Amino acid sequence: MRNQHSLEEIAEIHSLLEDIKGEYEKGIRAVIKKNNPELFGNPHTIPKLQKIQINRGLGLAAQNTNILKKSINEFTAITGQKPIITRAKKAIAGFKIRENMELGLTVTLRGSKMYSFLTKLIFFTFAQIRDFRGLSVRSFDKAGNYTLGLKEQLIFPEIDYDDVDQTQGFSITLVFSSTAPKSRSKTMDRVLNGMVLFKFLRFPLNDSGYYDKYSSFSEVSQAWDRKKHLRRKRWSQE
C-alpha cells in the first residue's frame, strides 16, 4: 500500500541546482528512492521525463504562407528547434481538407533542449499566465503522461509583442518513461507516479491535496469511479 503523503516530500529538496536536469540526476532521484524504497528500490523504475511534444493546429490557416512562416519562426524561437509540418493523412471533403495538406506544426524535444524548455516553462512562463491558479492533476492520461494547453505565445520571453499579428496557442505534452514491473503498471499507479515526479520538479499543481486524504491507490481509483458515475447520472437526468 502506497502512502499518498509522499507527494509532499518535495520539501526535502532545499536548493535549485544549475538546471532541472542536474537537479533530477543529483537530487530528485536519490530523494525519491530514499522516501519510497518499496516503490523504487530499483533506480531504473524511477519515472523520468523522456520527451516533450509541442503541437499547434492551424487548420485551413496553414495554407496562408505568412501565417505558416510566422508560426514556424515562433516555434523555432521558443523551442530552439525547427518544427515539423503536420499534414492530413487522408482527404475529408466536409472540412475541405485534401490529402497531404498542411494542418499544423509539431516539435519533439529531448535531452538538453527538453530540460532547457522545461526550466523556462516552470520558472518563467507559468508566472506570465493571467489569473494562473496552478495545473490540474486531472490532465494526466492513462499512460501517466501530462498534457496542458496554453492560449497564447506572448507568455514566452522570446516572442516580441510587436511581431505578433494574432495570438495562437498550442498544447504541450510531457511524456514520462518508467520501467516499473507489470504488477505496478495500472493506470492509477502511472498517474500517481507522475504526480510524485511533478511535485519534485516544482510543477505548480493546484489540487494535489485532494489525494492526501486517501491512504491507498485503490481508494483513489474508487473515488474516481464514483465521480464518473455521478457525472453520468447527472447527464442522464438532463
Swiss-Prot record:
It is found in: Plastid, Chloroplast. Binds 5S rRNA, forms part of the central protuberance of the 50S subunit. Part of the 50S ribosomal subunit; contacts the 5S rRNA. Belongs to the universal ribosomal protein uL5 family. One of its GO terms (cellular component) is ribonucleoprotein complex. Its main location: plastid. This is Large ribosomal subunit protein uL5c. One of its GO terms (biological process) is translation. HAMAP family: Ribosomal_uL5_B. It comes from Trieres chinensis. InterPro entries: Ribosomal_uL5, Ribosomal_uL5_bac-type, Ribosomal_uL5_C, Ribosomal_uL5_dom_sf, Ribosomal_uL5_N. GO terms for molecular function: rRNA binding; structural constituent of ribosome.
